[in-house]
């Protein structure tokens, strides 16, 4: 398995992985999978910001992907990112997610970001919560019943981790 930056040729496989999670899971609260063109636009938006967009590759197949995006658009949040991570169902529970998340955190820390937020759709998503705990995240709050998918209301779990970034306080 190798972790590397996303290239355009990866996007069809990423779109299929994400579509699976949209249609069968609560990790994303979208109801309809985005098109390949939309996935391409989203990935390019992350890359244009200079943020990592990583894929895990096993035998030339994409096993999963992870990327960081700004937590909020306002300037006061500029040192905080949100992670997103999705695995191909055939590659879950093999440690790939943890390796992807750890590499994402390392790269974001080296870029000077201080904090990473995980917004986990559904408090019953124990696998994602455990994954983030293993990577050093701690739960900081739960918003109850704020989402709706598959005929039920869903909680959103917020987790936070400090990144490997300098401890100095930046000037405005």
Residue positions per predicted region:
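C-terminal "cap" of GNAT-fold acetyltransferases
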Residues: 79-81, 145-172
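Conserved GNAT acetyl-CoA-binding A-motif
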Residues: 108-120
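Conserved catalytic-core motifs of GNAT/GCN5-like acyltransferases
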Residues: 67, 119-120, 133, 138-155
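A short beta-loop-alpha structural element at the N-terminal edge
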Residues: 2-16
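Conserved GNAT-fold acetyl-CoA-binding loop/helix
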Residues: 15, 19-43
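Conserved acetyl-CoA-binding loop-helix of GNAT-fold acetyltransferases
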Residues: 93-108, 126, 130-134
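Acetyl-CoA-dependent GNAT
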Residues: 8, 33-90, 101-102, 107, ...
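Glycine-rich phosphate/pyrophosphate-binding loop shared by adenosine-nucleotide-utilizing enzymes
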Residues: 1, 61-65, 154
């Amino acid at each position: 398995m190798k972790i590397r930056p996303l290239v355009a040729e990866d996007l069809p496989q990423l779109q299929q992985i994400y579509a699976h999670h949209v249609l069968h899971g609560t990790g994303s609260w979208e109801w309809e999978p985005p098109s390949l063109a939309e996935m391409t636009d989203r990935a390019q938006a992350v890359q244009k910001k200079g943020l990592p967009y990583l894929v895990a590759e096993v035998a030339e197949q994409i096993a999963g992907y992870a990327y960081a995006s700004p937590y909020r658009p306002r300037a006061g949040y500029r040192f905080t990112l949100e992670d997103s991570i999705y695995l191909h169902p055939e590659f879950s529970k093999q440690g790939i997610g943890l390796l992807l998340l750890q590499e994402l955190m390392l790269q974001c820390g080296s870029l000077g970001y201080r904090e990473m937020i995980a917004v986990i759709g559904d408090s019953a998503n124990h696998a994602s919560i455990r994954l983030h705990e293993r990577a050093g995240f701690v739960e900081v709050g739960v918003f109850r019943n704020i989402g709706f998918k598959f005929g039920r209301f869903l909680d959103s779990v917020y987790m936070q981790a400090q990144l490997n970034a300098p401890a100095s306080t930046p000037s405005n």
